[in-house]
């Protein structure tokens, strides 16, 4: 039971990190493209033309789930 609790806490920590301000600041600037490519592997990212601009991405503080919704055609 203890091992299951540890695994669950690790998973939740990773999910929480994807939405934290520190994570968003870390992927601001030129790291945005790398982050989008990491979130949308194997598909042309943002092919619907809704790629967030670096200024918008950083000022709005998009979480990874919001970027997936905007940019990954298979996640919708």
Curated annotation (Swiss-Prot):
Q: Which Pfam families match?
A: Ins_beta
Membership in a protein family: Belongs to the insulin family.
Predominant location category: secreted
Q: What is this protein called?
A: Probable insulin-like peptide alpha-type 3
Its taxonomic placement starts with: Eukaryota, Metazoa, Ecdysozoa, Nematoda, Chromadorea
Task: Tell me the keywords, alphabetical order.
Answer: Disulfide bond, Secreted, Signal
> In the record, which residues are listed under signal peptide?
1-18
Protein localization = Secreted
GO terms of molecular function: hormone activity
Query: What is the originating organism of this protein?
Result: Caenorhabditis elegans
Instruction: Please report any disulfide bonds recorded for this protein chain, giving both cysteine positions.
Output: 28-58, 40-71, 46-72
- Output a single Gene Ontology CC term carried by this record: extracellular region
